Amino acid sequence: KALPRTEDQAAILFAEEVRKKEMQKQKVKRLALSAGISAFLLVASVVIFAYTVGFDFVKDSYFGYSTKELLEKEWITSEYGEPAIIISSPKVLKRTIDEKIQNNLPENVKSTSRFAYGNITDDFSIVLITTAYKDTTKIDLDLALEADLKELEKFGAKNIIVKTGEFENVKGLSGKKAYGTFTAFDPDSEEDIKMQYDIMVLSQPGGAQEFFFMYREEDEYAKQIIEKIQNSIELRKAKK
């Protein structure tokens, strides 16, 4: 049978319980303070990095622009490739080089260049390909569209639904287009997502230009961006 506790023993046990609870509180406070400091340092690091390299660079590289922001921001007019094509766009397209393509050009091709913004599963992306021929070759636009749809598959598109039609912008430039939907695997969500695309092919003696626009399904801002880019297109004559 347990002996009854004395008042001194009870006081000691009570004091021990109080001490344990106080230690637990201090531990929680230290953890919270540590987490707060870590979060502050992370935010501070991002801000300093963004200030150093530019907020546009950080947003572009890590967060991306919404199509509404792209549509409403100040646009840039640039010249790309050969034969040169001039377009206005919300962001400058960056040249990409595929050594395999460059080292295996068809006999009649003088040069080809590729420029891009974004990736296939981004809210909005563009690929522009320019090709210069050694002679006054004018490509078959229907065959070019078929090749471009195969190129879309290389980008990662699956279940491609295709519609075709004519293209003409406000400046009178005309060509062929293919448009529709596809699915692509999104590494962020680890799921297939449904996208829309517009492909345009323009041709002139000695050269051709091909556009790929890819965007989230039913994104009205993306459609307005595409229309605005299309209407800005100007072509330079192919160099002889």
Regions found by a protein language model. Name each.
Residues P90, D142-L149, D198-I199, K223-Q230:
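Extracytoplasmic/secreted envelope proteins and their assembly/folding machinery
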Residues T112-E146:
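A short acidic-to-branched-hydrophobic micro-motif
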